[in-house]
Amino acid sequence: MSSISLIQPDRDLFSWPQYWAACFGPAPFLPMSREEMDQLGWDSCDIILVTGDAYVDHPSFGMAICGRMLKAQGFRVGIIAQPDWSSKDDFMRLGKPNLFFGVTAGNMDSMINRYTADRRLRHDDAYTPNNVAGKRPDRATLVYTQRCKEAWKDVPVILGGIEASLRRTAHYDYWSDTVRRSVLVDSKADMLMFGNGERPLVEVAHRLAMGEPISEIRDVRNTAIIVKEALPGWSGVDSTRLDTPGKIDPIPHPYGEDLPCADNKPVAPKKQEAKAVTVQPPRPKPWEKTYVLLPSFEKVKGDKVLYAHASRILHHETNPGCARALMQKHGDRYVWINPPAIPLSTEEMDSVFALPYKRVPHPAYGNARIPAYEMIRFSVNIMRGCFGGCSFCSITEHEGRIIQSRSEDSIINEIEAIRDTVPGFTGVISDLGGPTANMYMLRCKSPRAEQTCRRLSCVYPDICPHMDTNHEPTINLYRRARDLKGIKKILIASGVRYDIAVEDPRYIKELATHHVGGYLKIAPEHTEEGPLSKMMKPGMGSYDRFKELFDTYSKQAGKEQYLIPYFISAHPGTRDEDMVNLALWLKKHRFRLDQVQNFYPSPLANSTTMYYTGKNPLAKIGYKSEDVFVPKGDKQRRLHKALLRYHDPANWPLIRQALEAMGKKHLIGSRRDCLVPAPTIEEMREARRQNRNTRPALTKHTPMATQRQTPATAKKASSTQSRLQNAGAKKRPKAAVGR
């Protein structure tokens, strides 16, 4: 893109002078023990990072990026990975940090990592050696912070990672089915960094190193802090209540009074006086030094409509070019959330990914297998961010809507490093992507629009005319990468946004011809307009167009390749009829899904707001605004999931029962247009056996009152009568001896 963005940082990420400890030189791995610190010549760590993941020195792991970034700034950084949280001892293994503790639950939310969408316990953990579950606690951010405070009470604790990022305000917690306070309040940490943390982390570390107390560091973007009142010099907008139209003054009648010149007298011209020219300072932009006061925690917990209102405001204040600060009351204090950080430039992204990662797990794990690492060890991350804005996804809220791309040279250098240094490389790059495969180098063509836009999605309901959809940079990158010596294949495993891809068929041709290993993942998520409108996903027309082009180019290349669509069940806005129509679509197109996903209400997502409140935060919120149907309850969620697997005989009884209740009994049978087969004789006998009335057998001697009783009542009455008879037998006098 030729135009220069108006969203620029105050200073470059790598422009800070290095901390004095840079004299110790580089570290092969960031130390996890005192022995490693001794080998590096360190007597202490300046910063200690605590994480719920195993330490893998790879740029796909957040703690590796943060640790290497801080080490490049000259700080001595240690890592405590998956500590024993039963006491404070494991949190003291590296000694007392000179500056602060950085705490994260890991690459995933600890609750999502631990529980399924049906709140069932998982028995594995892909971020743990040997896939062992139970190595991190529930709500790991809270637990780790508590132990850090117990270990060293006077050391600041800074929260980060996706778990803290998505819980920075009062939020609905699916696992406890209630609204919880901001994690910053519950944890009693000193600061929270949300989103990608390079900029705020580096700035805060240097300011702490220069002696500034953390209580006075309150102006850093991408951070949240606890305050007693609004920061000085900021003006506020009160949005604690729903907007209501005020009193409208009557419009004066233009001919109600005589005008000054109505007497037709000539008006003497006024003599213009010379005035000195004064240079006016530029007017401040309306979002500068402005905060929005959200409804308090107590209000959003007690009023679902106000919760939806607060959620809507938060999602509209995410553009770093025009976002205002947010403030939310929790008891007698406030959570103050600064505007998002300025996205990294291409040069800064290149520098971050050029840090000396070893691209392997820490040697302390030996030969243990870490599934998350196995998945990404031959993949390359080419960009960050996503402007899709899907309601159920947290990527936009975490990484931002502006795409941050690496340069072509930087990506090629990383591919060559994988080829030359990573053990077990066979010549196949497993993925060249990011949150979305085909958003590389795509940005808004209008700098002014990019700076001021508050749209939740750049592609829904239609692709914005300002959005650049030219895939030529991506195509050139693919071609250069696959021409490298020693590279046999470049696969694309990240999801493809097909509604953007159809705008540039050249990309689809390149993809189908060279970069698909038989199957390509895409995510229509649903086929019906009701749920799609709540998901902010395109209709099936874009999917059909993409499939047509993909099949055509695959055939031209002489390859037999298939699309694997992903769907979500039980999403807000999805009725039983919608799921039946989706199941019929799947059967018509001969799809039999093995893995299906029920909607998982994660914190901060718009879909989670719909799930909890029954309101639509994508439109203006009011007590009489649009209600959203929400499939809740285990039975209905099981049904929606079962309909995605209509071909599984175990789901047929549940589907038949639902079809009969909906008046769609014609979909049960052996005809081609039927969804499930009719029950067999054995199934009908088994159903009758299970539904058989278990009332006891009656005779003509059974009292009429007992006959009218239900089985439970009859059993209770029989038990009472038996007790009375036994009591009477005990009170009866004994017969005289010899009578």
Swiss-Prot record:
Domain Radical SAM core, by residue range, is: 372-650
Residues that coordinate or bind [4Fe-4S] cluster: 386, 390, 393
For whether the record's keyword set contains Metal-binding, the answer is: yes
Alphabetic keyword roster: 4Fe-4S, Iron, Iron-sulfur, Metal-binding, S-adenosyl-L-methionine
Bias-annotated ranges (Basic residues): 729-739
The protein's matches in Gene3D superfamilies, at most eight in alphabetical order, are given as: tm_1862 like domain
Task: List compositional bias (Polar residues) regions by residue number.
Answer: 704-725
Q: Which note does the record give on the cofactor?
A: Binds 1 [4Fe-4S] cluster. The cluster is coordinated with 3 cysteines and an exchangeable S-adenosyl-L-methionine.
What family name appears in the similarity comment?
Answer: Belongs to the UPF0313 family.
Kindly provide the name given to this protein in its UniProt entry: UPF0313 protein YgiQ
Please name the source species. Answer: Escherichia coli O6:H1 (strain CFT073 / ATCC 700928 / UPEC)
